[in-house]
Each structure stands twice: as structure tokens, then as C-alpha cells.
Amino acid sequence: MLYFVGRIYGYEVVNYTNNILIIRKNKGSSVPKQFVGIYELIEEHDEYMKLRREMDLSNALINVKGKIITAKNSTITRASMFNPFDTLIVEKRRNLRGVKKTIVIKKGITAILKQQQNTMIIRIAKSLHNKKPIPLAPDTDWFEIIS
């Protein structure tokens, strides 16, 4: 069971229990937080990889508590985790017409090397509050999404 409550990339994870994730937009202490949505996470597939102490950060994605690391084609969120293998990542992508906000909720892994593509895959269900599929970002070099 994955327990995660914290703030990620301008969003706040309000609660995560029984595979239900509630997210709100974090606008600051003086502004009310906007409700973003409730999402259901199902069918987790775990493949663990040991964290290497020395690695090229430009070619790797590392989720460490309190650290923000930018990897290829993606901005990785500030991750807080209670278990080194349990992390949620929220990603925001930009398109040619302007800013396109895409919330991608997936199971993060502790470390991914450019030459060794071990991943953790999580199946993303439809949003519970509007019954529409969650928009997914295109596949990158380091993660795979099963829809």
C-alpha cells in the first residue's frame, strides 16, 4: 500500500487511501486552494532498482526527498516519500501554442539510468469526478504507462 500526503509541483496531495488520490492546486496560504480532482490508481507493477551514489544526473532521474532534478524532456517534481520506492510524480508539459497543463500521476522509481531502463508501471484509471480519461504525456525514455 502506498501512502503519500504532501505537496508536489504546485499541487497538494490531500489524501491517498484505498488507491484514491485527491489533489488540490496550491496557490499560497492567502488564496483558497482550488480542487483539482480525485484519481484512482490501480494495478501497481514494481521493479526495484538500487540507488547508485554516483551517477550522471543529466542522464538519470532520481527521486530524493526534497530534491528537484530535471531530466530529459521533463520537469520532475519535488518528491516527498515515506518509502524510498513509493513516489508520485506530477509532470507539467508545454506545447507549441502555449502552456498545456497535464497532470501525469505515475509510480516513480528511485533511480533510472540512461542505459538501464528498469521502470515501475502504474495503471492510470479514469478520473472519478468527471469520468473522462486522464490526459497522458507522450512516452519518454525512462517511463512507460499502461492505459
From Swiss-Prot:
Entry superkingdom: Viruses
UniProt name for this protein: Uncharacterized protein ORF147
Origin organism of this chain? Acidianus two-tailed virus
